């Protein structure tokens, strides 16, 4: 396809199956970038200029009730392609929020599922909203809802599949979530360092997943910071990211 001119550099390569947490996604800039790609069915997408990545969670009951959560903003680690921070609510205009949430509802209804579905989107430099991926399950982008929303995504999922009235999707307060992942060059029995330095900070809510072993970039937990000042919450999240170390026992 490249030799025929049907695909040009740069582009995004995605494995058709078994992609998660940044795995199975690569930015390809030249022929050298093709050398280490997996030999599998794949999707190739044009690399576009974007200014933000967004997510909207939608809940659907069998009886037809549908509710969306307010749109959130996702910030990704440039090296691992993993979500690093979630900002709730997204720092975009009200017009764009309405547009994103309406689009997510339309997409969710077309899947005809019962449960919850996260619709991930790109916000382009021209303020276009494009669908990136969908995930029909509880999603990392809404883990903050445990503390930050009237109804967590996990409770909402149970309400939806049991065909119970859906809970309020309104946010309780501004939140920033930071993912905790395994350090580079660390593989083995996990050890968490410096938690004592952050658990006393007001508004900090840690969640450890109980995984026995760590490896580079493996999601081991997350921390949600609740604060009326979302910029302050983001600064605290960055401090936590620099302080907490997830490594292996010596």
Language model features with spans:
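A short, glycine/Asx- and small/polar-enriched loop/turn
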Residues: 7-8, 124-130, 217-219
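Internal nucleotide-binding/catalytic subdomain
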Residues: 24-126
């Amino acid at each position: 396809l490249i030799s025929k001119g049907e695909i040009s550099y740069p582009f995004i390569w995605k494995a058709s199956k078994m992609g998660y947490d940044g795995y199975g996604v690569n930015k390809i800039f030249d022929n050298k970038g093709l050398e280490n790609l997996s030999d599998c069915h794949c999707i190739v997408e044009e690399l576009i200029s974007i200014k933000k990545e967004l997510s909207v969670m939608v809940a659907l009951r069998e009886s037809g009730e549908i509710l969306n959560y307010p749109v959130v903003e996702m910030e990704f680690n440039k090296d691992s392609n993993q979500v690093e921070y979630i900002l709730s609510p997204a720092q975009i205009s009200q017009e764009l929020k309405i547009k994103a949430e309406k689009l997510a509802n339309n997409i969710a209804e077309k899947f005809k599922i019962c449960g919850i579905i996260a619709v991930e989107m790109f916000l382009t430099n021209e303020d276009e909203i494009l669908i990136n991926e969908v995930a029909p399950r509880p999603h990392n982008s809404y883990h903050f809802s445990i503390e930050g929303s009237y109804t967590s995504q996990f409770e909402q999922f149970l309400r939806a599949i049991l065909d119970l009235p859906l809970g309020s999707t309104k946010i309780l307060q501004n939140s920033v979530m930071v993912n905790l992942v395994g350090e580079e060059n660390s593989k083995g029995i996990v050890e968490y360092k410096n938690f004592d330095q952050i658990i006393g900070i007001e508004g900090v809510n840690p969640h450890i997943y109980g995984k026995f072993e760590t490896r580079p970039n493996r999601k081991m937990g997350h921390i949600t910071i609740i604060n009326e000042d979302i910029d302050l919450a983001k600064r605290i999240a960055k401090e936590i990211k620099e302080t907490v170390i997830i490594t292996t026992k010596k």
